[in-house]
Amino acid sequence: MMPTGNFDLNEVKRRMQGAVQSLKHELGGLRTGRASASMLDPVQVEAYGSHMPLNQLATVSVPEPRLISVQVWDKSMVKAVEKAIVDSNLGLSPATEGQVLRLRIPELNEERRKELVKVAHKYAEAAKVAARHVRRDGLDVLKKLEKNHEMSEDDQKRHADEVQKVTDGTIAEIDQLLAAKEKEILTV
């Protein structure tokens, strides 16, 4: 959380950039057309009593342009990995052979493109919500500082305006990332 003794706008900026970086990572997983090991980066597997990234349970490789191979290290985790991939909303159906899952990357039809755009919108909305939470936290710190007479009302309003400008810039960056990804998905 933010320091309560004084206000740090850089902390607000850093946390908002965290939301943007998270969105970039999630959108990066929405690949179009070609297979990529990073497509599976967002996949979380329920394993050993917690959620773990797929790459901590298996080796992911791309032997062909439209095929992803997932070599699960622990035989007892194959079903959990398979379920996580199916539940990930990436539109991939694993074909399991022992401890190896093969994922054919389907040609993107119009329906799948629209589904991917919806998923991208969902990710972008989550990033906007995260940015708004950071804004709220920052404004709460400012209100406390003013209430405790550690900051003047004028300074509080000035800092609140700065927080709003950072928020507006972050939301605009999120919208820009979403528009670029949407264009990439819909380009046939």
UniProtKB/Swiss-Prot annotation:
Any one Gene Ontology cellular component term annotated for this protein: cytosol
Signal peptide limits: none
Pfam families reported for this sequence: RRF
Key words, A-Z: Cytoplasm, Protein biosynthesis
Source superkingdom: Bacteria
GO MF: ribosomal large subunit binding
Subcellular localization: Cytoplasm
Family assignment from sequence similarity: Belongs to the RRF family.
NCBIfam families the record matches: frr
A Gene Ontology BP annotation from the UniProt entry: translation
Coiled-coil region(s): none
Protein name stated in the entry: Ribosome-recycling factor
HAMAP family according to UniProt: RRF
Functional note: Responsible for the release of ribosomes from messenger RNA at the termination of protein biosynthesis. May increase the efficiency of translation by recycling ribosomes from one round of translation to another.
InterPro entries hit by this protein: Ribosome_recyc_fac, Ribosome_recyc_fac_dom, RRF_sf
Family matches, as CDD domains: RRF
